[in-house]
Swiss-Prot record:
GO terms classed as biological process: response to antibiotic
GO cellular component term, pick one: plasma membrane
Disulfide bonds: none
Chain positions recorded as substrate binding sites: H71, V101
Catalytic activity: a primary linear alkyl sulfate ester + 2-oxoglutarate + O2 = an aldehyde + sulfate + succinate + CO2 + H(+); 2-ethylhexyl sulfate + 2-oxoglutarate + O2 = 2-ethylhexanal + sulfate + succinate + CO2 + H(+); hexyl sulfate + 2-oxoglutarate + O2 = hexanal + sulfate + succinate + CO2 + H(+); pentyl sulfate + 2-oxoglutarate + O2 = pentanal + sulfate + succinate + CO2 + H(+)
Record-linked InterPro entries: AtsK-like, TauD-like_sf, TauD/TfdA-like
Induction context: Repressed by the transcriptional repressor Rv3405c.
Organism: Mycobacterium tuberculosis (strain ATCC 25618 / H37Rv)
Name of the protein in question: Alpha-ketoglutarate-dependent sulfate ester dioxygenase
Amino acid sequence: MTDLITVKKLGSRIGAQIDGVRLGGDLDPAAVNEIRAALLAHKVVFFRGQHQLDDAEQLAFAGLLGTPIGHPAAIALADDAPIITPINSEFGKANRWHTDVTFAANYPAASVLRAVSLPSYGGSTLWANTAAAYAELPEPLKCLTENLWALHTNRYDYVTTKPLTAAQRAFRQVFEKPDFRTEHPVVRVHPETGERTLLAGDFVRSFVGLDSHESRVLFEVLQRRITMPENTIRWNWAPGDVAIWDNRATQHRAIDDYDDQHRLMHRVTLMGDVPVDVYGQASRVISGAPMEIAG
């Protein structure tokens, strides 16, 4: 099977398309290893034409790459919360740059996203390479960020700030009901590649030791660096598409350019580890429990 797999690089810093593979829970271990290697190298990988996948097969395939884990805000409210998280435009549009679930100490290592229902136009997703962003920092900013920590919280989420519908308000109340607060290093060391990556995104509320004005200014500086066009890739979804990204080395955002059409994606996230900074210090839980396997 692996003789048929091809990995086509899509950009100099991020993104690859993998062809010649049929995703599912019965995938050959050698093929899984090739996918994992491509993911670490390219940060986000894409698959076309995976129409055979349903929720069960998506979950089974994701389990070959790691340990599936539900959303911590949902798990905090219900022990039987589903492992698959629906990304449903009815309840909000994640159209600000973020890394998934960084308000938890051991936020997800990776995510597997499948297109379920797509608008007739628009609805693309952008990803940014946070390892490349760190590598391109000037030395003064590297020195600053390597000694900086940030407070991440689910009370400052990434959903649009436009006026909310009743469904969106209800979703936000559920999302924010558990109080998650974690202090992460702004530069974390990737546990598999050893790369240094910038850990920011719109779950950041402030930087430790800085006031609100200083935090806002520095946040904008870092986000501008991370989301430079050269660090990004845009994926235009088609039915049957699947994307997998390394959540430890990327940010992403959906593009809200499909008006009032419906967009539904199903996401499986994989258990992550607690970040450590360049000095070996681990992230600190301020409030809320680390992510756990349901049951």
